[in-house]
Amino acid sequence: MSLDYNTCVTRYSDQFKKILIAPDYLQKIQELASRIVERKLTEVHHLVDRNQELKRFITGLMGEAALEQLLDINIIDWTVGDSYHYHYPDIPGYKVGIKTVERNKFPIIFKKNWYPQIICIRSDKFENLVFVCGLATPDVLNEFQSDDLIVDPALRKRGTKTGFYGFSRLKPVSGISDLYSYKIGSK
């Protein structure tokens, strides 16, 4: 199956929410990302996967910042530590993660997903622009995936992650009420 970005992503872009991140907040994000990357130099799996690491952390944090604005909650964890301390969903109090990717790339996800992800795209034209695309349920994440979307051969070889292309099945996210069914402790 051939998957191209325009067919899988761009054709749905009129449904995405545009979020501008303030320049001073973007600067704080860049500084945090630098501290994180410096700390990751001590972790073996980060020594193996050094390609564009600073840019990836900035991109991920920008998605979190965009959702902070959209949902009017604090999301970014400003602490720096070992990766194993950070294996939990991104949105505090909710079983919801955030996947942010550069424009013209597909989000990389785990092959088996247990909680939803809000998918975001970082603009390639404006440094501080993020598109909030929508929420992918675990069923959607687990169905619409392809290893062919992984560009990095080393990551593909590890076999734990895959590319996501189910933008046609994303649920819109306009506010925190859209996530209530994923609130920790709710039935």
What are these regions (language model features)?
Residues 1-92, 99-187:
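Nucleic-acid endonuclease domains
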